[in-house]
């Protein structure tokens, strides 16, 4: 998420270096110094390397020598430069006498684009060297971020070019250029496309220089986007085809554009416009009185951050708005601040506190438990999360609390400590925090909370407080016992379940409560381990070559192998334009044990023998006797870096030629298998991830048949020359493709896991096929919609949030479990959720869960309120279970016990532990629970937890005194502004609604409230904060480490005021008549209409291997009555410079003071699923109008390099008579209901279907007219229900993806 601490936090500002000093620093850093790098991996010892700054690309690089760069980081990603040894990398060597560097000789660079930052921990040779690096990098951080967009583009272009031209020869091949453009999201159809645009290539080599590359980029960006409806482009010579550098936009024309189209009042000053143009261009040849833009430069300006839709003047803190009581502000708040991942097994980290505080968070949480040596530790109690020292946390808070903001920090203490350790806590609070700790009221006579200005640079303690005159006493908590709270579990931890298909054991998180055993989906057993483990080495270094794409094994007998190698190299190099040095390695046909290196040079294939010999019983490999290698892999790696030398030439091995037919020997490949046969095989393996690959009848075409979400699906793979295509993702071979999707999801969360053939079926196949895996029956020659099988009840899991549009529909959140689902035709199903029975919901919002009655009897007990929340896989009723230890173990696991249920015949669950002690403890506790379950549950529900508070700690609590929420006190004299209440989201939802929202807002005008995620969110997901905010809750605590929409909304809310962590709530919310859920209660606010056209985008990020097909979702989020979404069409295969057809989107907003405009860029993948690419979210009150850039961010709200949308935006006031200008008489909400612009679902009306055929699934052609007739005949079973909806995946069985539009 966007780090808000500017580089000045590290020392720039009044003490910034002079121009001469900057020049000296930059030269010194460019030359570089030798420093010792401390690794994050335990297996790597510290090493001395040369570190340099590449000013052309603004990167820090390191290497052992001058030849090869081993690593680099972008300076734009640096968040903090920290002097000293404060990093985990240094901590690992505290006890190692060989590595005890002087504190003053060390510094740490923290960088990254996620919440959890990476570290570069360095030891310099002197303190002066450290100061040089810190001072120089601090200046470079600020200068890099503030650089004008054309200069940023120049640096980006050089970074891309040098990533290929590693030897700095100022030339790359056409093949390299094609691959590079693919990496930046631009599809090059063929090599001829490049040759036509690079007419001045060197005749002999065909290489491309940097200048040619930069000119090609400029041409590609402009030519693709010159069709956009923009000022200047309509009338200039561009339309006649004249090159953009021959068309100029003068200073006067640009000034007129800023005034007329952009509404920039500062542009009335001609001198300011001139200065702006000069600073943007930074072109010495145009530092003249009348600067000008070329047309392509003007378009670049429109996409630039300098033309942002956000009013940057709102980024500054306004002290005049910081004089209200704290209860009038939204305050940026974190939940379980110490965690870096999930809530049950991730690492607790000091860096999480530093990161949150530097992001402007002003309320952080300390979860304190008794620790060793009389001092508390902080972690998520009764879980596997790691522990950190309370005292270390306080020192971290002191160091980082006021870097990003000077406004007060609230420490929310979750206290589980004994009296003795509470006293030590209080002592450390005073000792470490000193004068920053608030220990007495600002104003004793006040009748409300103090203001942020009154509390500047103060730290407040939120903790329970004793009554007057008590030394210590028991105080009741407001939290009642809940079996669903993981902190009340009897035991929890990682146990292992055996996969019935491959018999591997996989970790799952188990929770034992007073009556049930809950266990999660497959998880990681080492999430708390920050260390990056080395990849597993091959069983023998001599076998490393066997998995390399350049190794082809034995190609043929005698001279056949030589001929085959020559054919493969010739075809590959001619077709792809591969450079000299392209190569493959094969087994020698003539010399047993030797190999042959075949390579491409000057349009011919040449061969070279690789000799082998035994040396002391180990093989050695060499081309010449004077340079011998331990393995074939080492030999090839060497000659990829160092040239082969002979009398005639010198040449490095460049590009490996991939194997083309290696798939034929793989267990998953079937050369002659029909679709029906493939489905029948997969029906006998009821496991997601089962797959096979089959040859299709069409030339150069294959299909992957697989199981996902309990259903069989297919996708087509196409061989195009030397490239294998899946959708728009390119691979070198089928083997490469399957290997990739064994590690990465192919469809939603499903990875290829179980290769299926006849031998596998004999071992793991069921006797009876699972016909439920097929969506529909088959009609020979034509796929039909009708399902001849009877419908059955099942459970489904929500993929997205859905809000009911009618009274007979369900409302649910993402990951909700909907029970007793009855599938209906027309895209709408019925089900039970949230106490509502058999209501409608769109089927494309959910994924079907495995039928619990078929595979896992314990799934019948699924509980949506389990302590595992969305991670839940199964539930067992402990009294109904029988436990038995298996002394002999099972399948390489020694410590195994079985859980069986007599009520379910022939069913048992084998569970493995890591040790005998762990096994015995689990079995003992489960048996105890089985005997006393009812008594334990009754005791827990009857018990009101009470807590003893130490006087020394109570005295530190001044304003934030947690007390049980009492609705009866609201608005009475008994309400005390110093008291506050905390609510889990589930309890808060009872007050942030139409019935009680106004009353809760009244409470929040005087007192603080803190909302936090429910305990079942073990995956650290977040709830929707908007209802809490509009009802006045100040401390809406979120998991900052989670990159989801709620956190992105949180970052948007606090972007005004420079991310200082305090935003004054609108004055409307302090109006006694205001009701958060009734727009008629709005007084003094003028409703508005926002009209937006999405014109184009630049530099969208990639998602996986393919070129993206992007579309843009536009959303207004805010008050319930204002929230709506619309979307554009998708653009095929272009993420570098896509253009959308002109289409206006209109949004009516009644409460613009509490409204956000949100853009999300998705790609549509081959399954018609949408995958997140980028987003940008802004408060509506800070938007500019005109032709504006929308700078895009990643899911952590970090700026994406050069990524932006270009939109045209207008904001109109509503007319007093209720009509909306300029569209009087017609509701814009109705206008916006055009089905092609609605997100996720469409209610299809009779006769309104128009099918769109998706090529990746075209196994058979069908009649569109027949299908349209078929759709028309489908109706919802009740006349008053929604008529139908469009499925994102309408027909997975038959590879048909249809979309319906009104």
From Swiss-Prot:
Q: Which UniProt keywords apply?
A: Acetylation, Calcium, Cell projection, Hydrolase, Lipid degradation, Lipid metabolism, Metal-binding, Phosphoprotein, Repeat, SH2 domain, SH3 domain, Transducer, Ubl conjugation
Q: Which residues carry this modification: Phosphotyrosine?
A: 506, 771, 775, 783, 977, 1253
Question: PROSITE patterns this protein is in?
Answer: C2 (PS50004), EF_HAND_1 (PS00018), EF_HAND_2 (PS50222), PH_DOMAIN (PS50003), PIPLC_X_DOMAIN (PS50007), PIPLC_Y_DOMAIN (PS50008), SH2 (PS50001), SH3 (PS50002)
Task: Give the residue ranges for region: Disordered.
Answer: 522-545
Describe the location of the EF-hand domain by residue ranges: 152-187
Its catalytic activity? Answer: a 1,2-diacyl-sn-glycero-3-phospho-(1D-myo-inositol-4,5-bisphosphate) + H2O = 1D-myo-inositol 1,4,5-trisphosphate + a 1,2-diacyl-sn-glycerol + H(+); a 1,2-diacyl-sn-glycero-3-phospho-(1D-myo-inositol) + H2O = 1D-myo-inositol 1-phosphate + a 1,2-diacyl-sn-glycerol + H(+)
Q: Which residues bind Ca(2+)?
A: 165, 167, 169, 171, 176
What the entry lists under Pfam families is as follows: C2 (PF00168), EF_HAND_1_PLCG (PF23329), EF_HAND_2_PLCG (PF23583), PH (PF00169), PI-PLC-X (PF00388), PI-PLC-Y (PF00387), SH2 (PF00017), SH3_1 (PF00018)
Residues carrying Phosphoserine? 1221, 1227, 1233, 1248, 1263
Residue numbers of N-acetylalanine PTMs: 2
Q: What EC number(s) would the UniProt record show?
A: 3.1.4.11
Ranges for domain PI-PLC Y-box: 953-1070
Q: From what superkingdom does this record's organism come?
A: Eukaryota
Identify the enzyme class.
hydrolase
Q: Which InterPro entries match?
A: C2_dom (IPR000008), C2_domain_sf (IPR035892), EF-hand-dom_pair (IPR011992), EF_Hand_1_Ca_BS (IPR018247), EF_hand_dom (IPR002048), PH-like_dom_sf (IPR011993), PH_domain (IPR001849), PI-PLC_fam (IPR001192)
Domain comment from the record reads as follows:
The SH3 domain mediates interaction with RALGPS1. The SH3 domain also mediates interaction with CLNK.
What is the official name of this protein in its record? 1-phosphatidylinositol 4,5-bisphosphate phosphodiesterase gamma-1
Upper lineage: Eukaryota, Metazoa, Chordata, Craniata, Vertebrata
